[in-house]
């Protein structure tokens, strides 16, 4: 019962804060705030450079595999548990899912820099 009350309070508070942020936007919108600042001078060129979508996809793939390493690092300490089969199966499933994702990216040519 205590956990249910805590969850209900958290959901209510989150919904209330999101509603307030949505329904009470900032009324004073200044166009100067959207411009880049260069020591008080007008910028020489556009500050918003085009972003390579290929770089973004490779960066996201790198972050996924970096997360995999972070999730697999505790495995040597988990070997001390009594049920090692569950730990091994979980690690194998995690590596398999990420390997399938990498194979999919490779076949869809998502890791190619040139087109």
Curated annotation (Swiss-Prot):
Membrane topology summary? Multi-pass membrane protein
Subcellular location, record wording:
Mitochondrion inner membrane
- Segments spanning the bilayer are 4-24, 55-75, 84-104
Q: What is its EC number?
A: 7.1.1.2
Q: Can you provide one Gene Ontology molecular function annotated for this UniProt record?
A: NADH dehydrogenase (ubiquinone) activity
* InterPro entries documented for this protein: NADH_UbQ/plastoQ_OxRdtase_su3, NDAH_ubi_oxred_su3_sf
Quote the catalytic activity from the record. a ubiquinone + NADH + 5 H(+)(in) = a ubiquinol + NAD(+) + 4 H(+)(out)
Q: GO CC terms on record?
A: mitochondrial inner membrane; NADH dehydrogenase complex
Query: What broad class of enzyme is this?
Result: translocase
Per UniProt, the keywords (alphabetical) are: Electron transport, Membrane, Mitochondrion, Mitochondrion inner membrane, NAD, Respiratory chain, Translocase, Transmembrane, Transmembrane helix, Transport, Ubiquinone
Keyword set includes Ligase: no
Question: What's an example GO BP annotation here?
Answer: mitochondrial electron transport, NADH to ubiquinone
Q: Does the keyword Transmembrane helix apply?
A: yes
Q: Name one Pfam family in it.
A: Oxidored_q4
Q: What does this protein do?
A: Core subunit of the mitochondrial membrane respiratory chain NADH dehydrogenase (Complex I) which catalyzes electron transfer from NADH through the respiratory chain, using ubiquinone as an electron acceptor. Essential for the catalytic activity of complex I.
State the similarity comment.
Belongs to the complex I subunit 3 family.
Oligomeric and partner information: Core subunit of respiratory chain NADH dehydrogenase (Complex I) which is composed of 45 different subunits. Interacts with TMEM186. Interacts with TMEM242.
Name under which the protein is recorded: NADH-ubiquinone oxidoreductase chain 3
Q: Which gene encodes it?
A: MT-ND3
